[in-house]
Amino acid sequence: MTNKVRTRFAPSPTGYMHVGNLRTALYAYLIAKHDNGDFILRIEDTDQERLVEGALDVIYNTLKITGLSHDEGPDIGGPVGPYVQSERRNIYIEYAEKLIEKGEAYYCFCSKERLDMLRANSEALKRPFRYDKHCIDLSKEEIDKKIAEGVPYVIRQKNPTTGSTSFHDEIYGDISVDNSELDDMILIKSDGLPTYNFANVVDDHLMGITHVVRGSEYLSSSPKYNRLYEAFGWDVPIYVHCPPIMKDEHHKLSKRNGDASFEDLMAKGYLKEAILNYIALLGWNPGGEKEVFSMKELIEAFNYRNINKAPAVFDTKKLKWMNGEYIRALSLDKFHEMALPHYKEALTRDLDTKKISELLHTRVEVLNEIPEQLDFFNNLLEYSPEMYIHKKMKTTYENSLKSLEEVLPRLEALENWTFENIKEVCMNLVKELEVKNGVVLWPIRTAVSGKQFTPGGAFEIADILGKEETLERIKIGINKLKALQ
């Protein structure tokens, strides 16, 4: 089993799929698939107090939507299940007892009050809290007596106080820690469930995990993990600790602070492919100029040794740009299908939405921008006549009024209202008046939209609005300009 690359995504069902969690899943998936390996889903629910109802569905749905399909997991089974930690309780107790037999762990009966006192003393001395090994030398008789009396206990790792523990991480290199800094961490809690740290090591070994991908915040725990591997006589997996994702230079991206989850980004109109592509580049450098990768290309190109140590800043502008690239790469039909719900939300008039899609397809970066681009189609917005003055277009109040008054009867006479016919009428007027295009087209665009920036120009907007509405808006424009005289 260990000859084959096996990675795992092991989330806790505690709420939304945070961007950092999704990147961990993606990197683990890419490492496995780059070498035709297995990607395993394991649910870490040992911290029962933090569990959130419905969070498990979020995990399954996210993996399904993103296409990060697991080869083994709670929902599909596999050869090394169960894949939910709360269903493996007896396994952890068995392995904790093996450590006690080896002299690598011990029972601790210290009360909450005693531990609170130790913590308070540590805080007063401004030192990190470490358990004082009070129960390390209890005799078998004392232990048996306390267990028989029903005294609550935990099982702790027995760490040496001299020497050092070293480990290698593929991103951060060789790291060595003095054993005197290692706390005798709890392996089995008083409720009989394992701690996250202990369950991880046992499960990663029993499930044949070859590469452990996780955030750099777990670097400090890795020496304790290594001590467990050594105590059991197990091979240590390859560690890939990923740099943190930052909101800006000084603040980490955090779901506690309400920063974007995968669900939030999808709800804002980002495409799943763009989100995954962008997240892949948060810390990983493929080399070269290429930035837009399909999943197949990511699998082929991904090399975890090219992950940077430096924190990656989540740049919403960059994500938006990338999303725009993906939207433009869609077929018009596919874009139209994705835009339809936004049209239904934004439009109050019966318009040709396929024509609107032709306008927006190359102009929208995020689907949620669609409604704000369409407001003028419903009703002509109140606007200032000053909009008719445009230095670059060489328009004034006077020539704007002339253009609108000249084009109105020509458009009124148009029997077949199409884009091409509207364009022909307007361009013929440009020739007749012997002016630059903008002198005619800018006033028309202003009159029909009431906005300085619109998707599409005068011809497209007039075509979509229809004859009656276009003529009505041009008349309003004429009246606005006449009122200035």
From Swiss-Prot:
Lineage: superkingdom: Bacteria
Subunit structure, interactors included: Monomer.
Motif ('HIGH' region): 11-21
UniProt-annotated location(s): Cytoplasm
CDD domains reported for this sequence: GluRS_core
Function: Catalyzes the attachment of glutamate to tRNA(Glu) in a two-step reaction: glutamate is first activated by ATP to form Glu-AMP and then transferred to the acceptor end of tRNA(Glu).
Entry protein name: Glutamate--tRNA ligase
Keyword Cytoplasm: yes
Record: residues binding ATP: K255
GO biological process: glutamyl-tRNA aminoacylation
Entry keyword Cytoplasm: yes
Cross-referenced NCBIfam families: gltX_bact (TIGR00464)
GO molecular function per UniProt: ATP binding; glutamate-tRNA ligase activity; tRNA binding; zinc ion binding
Catalyzed reaction equations: tRNA(Glu) + L-glutamate + ATP = L-glutamyl-tRNA(Glu) + AMP + diphosphate
Gene3D superfamilies: 1.10.10.350, HUPs
Free-text cofactor note: Binds 1 zinc ion per subunit.
UniProt EC number: 6.1.1.17
Protein residues bound to Zn(2+): C108, C110, C135, D137
Family membership noted in the UniProt record: Belongs to the class-I aminoacyl-tRNA synthetase family. Glutamate--tRNA ligase type 1 subfamily.
Keywords recorded for this protein, A-Z: Aminoacyl-tRNA synthetase, ATP-binding, Cytoplasm, Ligase, Metal-binding, Nucleotide-binding, Protein biosynthesis, Zinc
'KMSKS' region, short sequence motif: residues: 252-256
Required cofactor(s): Zn(2+)
GO cellular component: cytoplasm
Main enzyme class: ligase
